[in-house]
Amino acid sequence: YLIMAILASLSKVYEQLIQINTKDKLFTYNSIAVDDEDGTVYFLGKYFENNSNKPKKKRAVNFHFELYKVDANGQSNNRFKSSNKYISSLALVKYKNHLACLGLYGKKDLTTSGVCLFNINQKTLQIEIEKYNPFSEQFLTDKFGNKKKLKKRAVKNGLDNITLNNIHVMENGDLIVYAEE
């Protein structure tokens, strides 16, 4: 892949030819983020393991995420995965001097139990903070009303068919997740 960072004045900041050693059928890009200050480009992708593009194999998560950083000095990358949570979607968020991966997670594949957040060190690409926030009682009440059985089932099994649409960054750095059924 050829990465070229260009300023608004159309002058080139840098150009890097990068190679990602993956089989195309086993790797999918999730998102991209660009640092407005220095033109650093971050790529996030999902790499399926065991030569299979099935999300689970033998009841275990069968993929990991790969984060790539490309700048004027070259490229670097880091891999990460959650062994006990199924991350159904994940997107890069670059705001001010922060880099994060934000998404949805579940206890099983194809269900969603809450929102996950990984704060990433921009220099090393290592995860500094990993958080899993289950859906709040207020969210479940808004969705199901006072139907206790449905809320209990949602807490136990997760919600079906939730799709991450967008992430909005507030001025103070708070993140708002837009998702829908």
Residue spans of the language-model regions?
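Blade-loop segments of beta-propeller domains
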Residues: Q19-D38, L44, K81-I87
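Signature of soluble extracytoplasmic/periplasmic domains of secreted precursors
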Residues: L104, D109-P134, T163-E181
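Alpha-solenoid helical-repeat scaffolds
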Residues: Y1-L2, A8-Q16, D24-F27, Y42-L44, ...
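Surface-exposed loop and turn segments in beta-propeller and other repeat-based domains
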Residues: L17-K25, G74-N84, T124-G158
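Structural signature of eukaryotic scaffold interfaces centered on beta-propeller domains
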Residues: Y1, N30-V41, A91-L99, Y105-D109, ...
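Beta-propeller blade signature
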Residues: L2-K12, K57-Q75, S113-Q126
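Extended, regular secondary-structure scaffolds
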Residues: A33, E37-L44, N53-P55, N62-N73, ...
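Short, conserved, GDST-rich strand-edge loop motifs in beta-rich repeat architectures
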Residues: Y1-L2, K46-V61, L104-V115, E180-E181
